[in-house]
Every structure is written in C-alpha cells, then in structure tokens.
Amino acid sequence: MRAAIFLALLSLFPAGCVDIVGADIQQVVREQKHFSTTGKPEVVLSTFDGSIEIRPWDKPDVQVIVEKRGRDDAAISSIEVHAEQSGNRVVVDVKAEKHGDRGFHLTWNFGRSAKLIVSLPAESDVTAKSGDGSIDVERITGKVDLRSGDGSIRARELSGEVNASTGDGSMTLEGKFGALRVHSGDGSVRIHAAPGSTAASDWDISTGDGSITLEIPDGFGAELDAHTGDGRIHVNEIPLSNVTGEIRRNTVRGRLGSGGSAVRLRTGDGSITLRRS
C-alpha cells in the first residue's frame, strides 16, 4: 500500500524536481543499550520504522539492541538513538534524521529502518510504538501499550491491562486480561482470553475492516454489545441471557455469565465470532 501511495505522489511532480531517497538495504549496524533497574521497570520504546520484539529474561535489568539498517554509511549515521533513564523508567527513542535542500526532497523510509530487540523482567510496564513495523511481545505481566502505524501486532501470555492499535494490520492477543482496548484500522482481530481473565473495566475491540474473534473462558461475566456493519455474528457454545437482537444478524446484545462491565465488539465490514477459549 505504501508503494502505491509513493507512486501516486511521485506522479504529481515534473521530471527533475524530485530527489528520491530510498534503496535496497545493504548494511546492518547494531547498537546496544543497557539499563540497571531495581524494581518493576517502566519501559518506553519507539522507532520511526522497524519491528519491535520484546521478551522477558531472568535478569533485573533492561537491554535494548537497536539494529540500524540502511543502504550505506550515510544512511546508517542518519539514524539517531536517544536513550535516557530516570529511576526505573527507561526510554529508548529511535529517529531518522530528515534530509532537506533546495526544491522538493522526498524521503521514503524503506531505505532506512531500526529494529528493536528488547529483553526485560517479566514484570514490567511496557509502551512500544513503531511508525511502520510489526510488534511481537510475549510473557509480560503489567500494563502493556502497543501501537503500530502500519504493521501486525502479536502478543502471547500477557497478564494485566492491555491497549493495542495498528493503522493497518492484523492483531492476535493471548493472555489473562483485565482491561482491554484493541483497534485495527484495517485487519482481522483475534483475542484469546485465558482462564482468570475478567472485565475489570469495559473491553473495546474494533476494526474498520476485518473479522473479530473473541475467545472467553468458562465463568466469564460481562455485558456483550456486538455490531458489524456488513457481516454476521456467531455465538458458539456461549450462553447468553437478556438477549436483544437476532444472533447471526449484525447486532447482538446480551449478558454473559453473571454480567459486569461492557464488552464492545465493532467491525465496519466483517464477521464477529464469540466462542469458548
């Protein structure tokens, strides 16, 4: 999709007026950051373009490896890593220096990227943001906030409060959730709520264009509010009471178990499936 946008933009300018930056990636340079922490760390990560991988380890410290990728030394050197620590709060922000000269200069980041490979304690609060890239997280207990401008999000064995959003990409989240807010601008969403998950506050799960699958454990209580603009709703082996609307049509409301906070499911174009985990 980005390539199509790029070509459309390029066609707007006459020959000789555009300086295009971007080529096949040829070099990779690694930069490592290490932070000593004494309690539960709060880790804030961001990269302008590139994937983010987050894994727990058995050390109390936080390690971030930045893989800078570019077509030559100049491209690599234009990638800047900003790192700071205040107590147990760790921030790593990777940015690409912008080019500018006479006339119109179009910079396209497929010539540069920065992947983050992160190791941290299993009990951590994590915020991760990629301007254009996938995010992959596993076995983290704490508050987790994941955001991608354009890329898939995968998370496994999480425990706690989770917020996740992507402008364009699929999402798969598995774990024991309390609070949950999930949105994809364009992509399917699958949520596997493990035993012990509770709607401690309202859950909001939505996609602009794609299917939603929510798997919940036995005994899960909430007020279901599901709607699809163009699709069907399937409720498989899940007892509902106080049902409003017709199951398999585009809107269903009802009580799950003993009720509780709201679980809202919304898709503009796609099916919604609710089943046991």
Locate predicted features.
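Intrinsically disordered, low-complexity terminal regions
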Residues: 1-277
